[in-house]
Amino acid sequence: MIYVSLTTIPQRIKYLNKSIESLLKQSKKPDKIFINIPFKYQRFKEVVSDNEIPKFDDSIIEITRCEDCGPGTKLLGSLNKLKKDSLVILADDDNAYEDYMVEKFFHFYSIASNNAYSFYVHPLGNFGIGQGADGFAINTNHLNGIKNFYDTVVKDYKELFLYDDLWISYFLYFFKKNKILSLREHLKKGI
């Protein structure tokens, strides 16, 4: 299975269609796109009511109402729906993605599924930080324990709560021993 998972916030929900449309136009279609929307937000007074959520005609899109885990809701909101031996691609709600994103991630996942991939990886010390804004592809087998990590290490620390790319990468590198590799050289050029 290939999943794409993202979240949104009240201020950006009106822009969600652009991101979703780009995901539906992928050269390799994901099997499921999760849009994880908290019932209420820790950072905002506003809420997203059911009638504010855009309606999508495509059956691969699933809206998941969930608790607010900050930007990490893009992963944690649908975590219990992800099957083993699958690829989950984290995306942001305010980006339109190139039509080859899913295909490239799946290609590299098929070759070396023990790695995680992003089109841009920010170096920090000995490990890289995958970027959801550029797509962040992870083998679902390596997510066992990440919710507990979030609950015990991240949830109550504002410094981490807002930086999902950092704590997800930290978990993958230090707890699951995954390399997080950049696919920057594999961006299409001149097309």
Where are these regions (language model features)?
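Active-site-proximal specificity loops/subdomain of glycosyltransferases
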Residues: 36-86
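Conserved donor-nucleotide/metal-binding helix-loop-beta segment in metal-dependent transferases, i.e.
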Residues: 99-124
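C-terminal catalytic/acceptor-binding lobe
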Residues: 1, 14-19, 155-191
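N-proximal low-complexity "stem/linker" segments adjacent to membrane-targeting elements
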Residues: 1-25, 34
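Short, acidic, metal-binding catalytic loop of nucleotide-sugar glycosyltransferases
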Residues: 19-31, 39-40, 52-55
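Short beta-strand-to-loop acidic/aromatic patch adjacent to the donor-nucleotide binding site
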Residues: 85-96
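Conserved nucleotide-sugar donor-binding
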Residues: 129-151
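Short loop->beta transition adjacent to catalytic acidic/histidine clusters or analogous donor-positioning motifs
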Residues: 2, 24-35, 59-61, 86
